[in-house]
From Swiss-Prot:
Expressed by the dorsal and submental skin glands. Pfam families: Antimicrobial20. It is found in: Secreted. The keyword Ribosomal protein does not apply. The keyword Secreted applies. Keywords: Amphibian defense peptide, Secreted. InterPro entries: Aurein_antimicrobial_peptide. This is Citropin-1.2.5. It comes from Ranoidea citropa. Disulfide bonds: none annotated.
C-alpha cells in the first residue's frame, strides 16, 4: 500500500542520511 512505500522511502532516506 501507499504507507508501505512511504516507510520504504523513509528507510532509504534514513540510511542515506547517516
Amino acid at each position: 500500500g501507499l504507507f508501505d512505500i512511504i516507510k520504504k522511502v523513509a528507510s532509504v532516506v534514513g540510511l542515506a542520511s547517516q
